[in-house]
């Protein structure tokens, strides 16, 4: 589960340390981002900064050094970033070899893996490094706005889903099973990175009260 948190002067504060009034403000923010979807949180990428908790490319977070993620497919690290609903957690995305990712790119068979985990800096081990990603960039939060152009952001958290392959109705197939759109990754905004053919990765989950449960990569599309 992803518990609520409050951003206070740029610092993440778990909701159990803040006042009732502040918790109400957080709930209102979640309401606008994931329920009424008036707003979204937008992320960009920039020069890699050591000791950050959000990056694309490079090595996986160190917490995966002793983890075996799949019995069947090779899995490679793609990106990680702090969960804005719980900045004490990170969300990491892994992908199999491209031919497998392409064959299984739709719901409910998508092979991309999402793992939520404790905060962890980049590993020194290249065990999960993606062989086709040479660059590494930090991921940072840009703004929380309404209708910011998706072409300008690497990740859009909340708001409305923005497909790039119109007519497939991938969103409708996932929503029909009771899932809700949580965030999307826009690879076209990532300089020098094109693992998914400048495509988009779409993450869904269950919204229960003011929490998101069981987030997963539902599908990805390419331009």
Per-region residue spans from a language model:
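Preference for intrinsically disordered or flexible, low-complexity segments
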Residues: 26-223
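Compositionally biased low-complexity segments, especially N-terminal hydrophobic helices
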Residues: 12, 24-26
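Short Gly/Ser/Thr- and charged-rich N-terminal loops/segments
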Residues: 7-11
């Amino acid at each position: 589960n992803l518990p609520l948190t409050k951003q206070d002067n740029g610092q993440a504060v778990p909701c159990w340390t803040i006042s009732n009034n502040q918790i109400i403000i957080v709930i209102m923010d979640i309401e606008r981002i994931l329920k009424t979807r008036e707003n979204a949180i937008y992320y960009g990428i920039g020069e890699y900064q050591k000791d950050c908790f959000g990056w694309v490319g490079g090595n996986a977070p160190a917490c995966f050094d002793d983890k075996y993620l799949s019995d069947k497919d090779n899995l490679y690290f793609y990106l990680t970033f702090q969960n804005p609903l719980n900045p004490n957690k990170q969300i990491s995305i892994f992908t199999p070899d491209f031919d497998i990712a392409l064959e299984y790119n739709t719901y409910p068979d998508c092979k991309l893996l999402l793992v939520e985990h404790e905060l962890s800096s980049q590993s020194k081990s290249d065990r999960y490094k993606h062989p086709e990603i040479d660059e590494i960039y930090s991921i940072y939060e840009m703004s929380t706005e309404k209708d910011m152009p998706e072409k300008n952001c690497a990740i859009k958290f909340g708001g409305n889903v923005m497909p790039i392959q119109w007519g497939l109705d991938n969103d409708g197939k996932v929503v029909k099973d009771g899932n809700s759109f949580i965030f999307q990754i826009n690879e076209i905004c990532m300089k020098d990175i094109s693992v998914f053919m400048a495509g988009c990765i779409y993450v869904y989950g269950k919204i229960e009260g003011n929490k998101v449960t069981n987030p997963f990569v539902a599908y990805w599309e390419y331009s």
